[in-house]
Curated annotation (Swiss-Prot):
Involved in nervous system development and function. Involved in the positive regulation of voltage-gated sodium channel activity. Promotes neuronal excitability by elevating the voltage dependence of neuronal sodium channel SCN8A fast inactivation. It comes from Homo sapiens. GO terms for molecular function: growth factor activity; heparin binding; sodium channel regulator activity; transmembrane transporter binding. Keywords: Disease variant, Epilepsy, Growth factor, Nucleus. The gene is FGF12. It is found in: Nucleus. A motif (Bipartite nuclear localization signal) lies at residues 11-38. Belongs to the heparin-binding growth factors family. The keyword Protease does not apply. This is Fibroblast growth factor 12.
Amino acid sequence: MAAAIASSLIRQKRQARESNSDRVSASKRRSSPSKDGRSLCERHVLGVFSKVRFCSGRKRPVRRRPEPQLKGIVTRLFSQQGYFLQMHPDGTIDGTKDENSDYTLFNLIPVGLRVVAIQGVKASLYVAMNGEGYLYSSDVFTPECKFKESVFENYYVIYSSTLYRQQESGRAWFLGLNKEGQIMKGNRVKKTKPSSHFVPKPIEVCMYREPSLHEIGEKQGRSRKSSGTPTMNGGKVVNQDST
């Protein structure tokens, strides 16, 4: 008796659940058009426009313009004084007799008409000349890193600052090494002397991106030999008069 009552109650509960589920599914199937509030014609027009938007909304492939590339060279710069210009990892610039030193490799990047940037390959720093004629190394490319490249009458190449020169005479300031292989102040170097004469010895031709030009004195990522001090190159006083 108790079992029959329990069975009957179970069947009633099951039927109630099934009827409720049927009503819910029926209500889902009967989505009355009247609830939309729009006519059949309006819905048709909206459907057409949605398809049009979908088709026209496809993104066309963007054609990227090729980045401007500059053809430069990896080279060694051999001075008539008998030294190769070199840049150490800490940014120190001097000369060495060791032709095979990796520190003598420089990127010569054209940045204007007969104007180049001289960048140490290993240090990734630029050779620069400040307003007092001292050479230093820079993390960023500034106007002080631009050098005019000229061929002298004896077929040696000379590099002069594009930014600074003698105010009275207008004489250019040159990159130079003295007889001891030390760098010289640019305003002490004369283009007629061996100290300013270099022979580029190209290793390979490379393509470079144009360096981003920064303002002079802009904060650099790493501390380097600062401009405006006579104790450049790790505390060695630059010999200003030796040629």
